Amino acid sequence: MRNPVDTAMALVPMVVEQTNRGERSYDIYSRLLKERIIFLTGPVEDHMATLVCAQLLFLEAENPKKEVALYINSPGGVVTAGMAIYDTMQFIKPAVSTLCIGQAASMGSLLLAAGHKDMRFATPNSRIMVHQPSGGFQGQASDIERHARDILKMKRRLNEVYVKHCGRTYEEVEQTLDRDHFMSADEALDWGLIDKVITSRDAVEGME
C-alpha cells in the first residue's frame, strides 16, 4: 500500500511566476514560505521538526524584524521533536504568530499556545486537545523505573510551558491535562490557549 504522505506530496500544486528572467515555478509551500508562512501539518516527528526549525531560522536570517506565521493542523507526536520547534520559536527574533486550522492536539496545542502574545488564533471549527505525555517502555525493571522518572519530569516541564503561555495556575494545568481534554476554538480562547477566534483574514490584520 502506498504511503499516504508520498501520495499527498505527489499532489502538491506548482505555482508559476513571471520574473525579469522568465518564468519560475515553485511548489505551493515554497511560494508561501516567501510570504513568511510555514505549515506544520501531520504528526510531529524529528524530520518534520527539522524542516520547521530550518524554515524559522531561514526567515529570521531573511528579516529578523518581520513576523512569521505558523499554520498548525497536527494530531501531535513526539515530545522532543515538538520541544525543538518550541525552543526555536522562542529563540528567533521575529514574532511568531500561530493559527490552528483543523486541529492542534497534544504537542500541536502546545505549539499553538507558544505563539507571540496576542498573535495566537484558531478558526471557528478547529479542535484543540491537551493531555499529559504518554510512553510505553519495556526492559529491565530498573530501566523502566528510570523511564518513568524521566516522563514525570517531562510532564512537569510541559505543564510549566502551558502555565507560562496560558495564564493558568500549575494546579489548573495539571488537572486539565490529566486526561485527554478536547476544546472548541471558543473554549480554547477561554482557557488561554489562543487570543482570538477568527473567521477572516481582516480579523488577523486588524490585530497586527
Swiss-Prot record:
Q: Does the keyword Hydrolase apply?
A: yes
Q: Which reaction does it catalyse?
A: Hydrolysis of proteins to small peptides in the presence of ATP and magnesium. alpha-casein is the usual test substrate. In the absence of ATP, only oligopeptides shorter than five residues are hydrolyzed (such as succinyl-Leu-Tyr-|-NHMec, and Leu-Tyr-Leu-|-Tyr-Trp, in which cleavage of the -Tyr-|-Leu- and -Tyr-|-Trp bonds also occurs)
- Subcellular locations according to the entry: Cytoplasm
Q: What is its EC number?
A: 3.4.21.92
Any idea which UniProt keywords this protein has? Cytoplasm, Hydrolase, Protease, Serine protease
Task: Outline what the protein does.
Answer: Cleaves peptides in various proteins in a process that requires ATP hydrolysis. Has a chymotrypsin-like activity. Plays a major role in the degradation of misfolded proteins.
Can you say what this protein is called? ATP-dependent Clp protease proteolytic subunit 2
- Source organism per UniProt: Rhizobium meliloti (strain 1021)
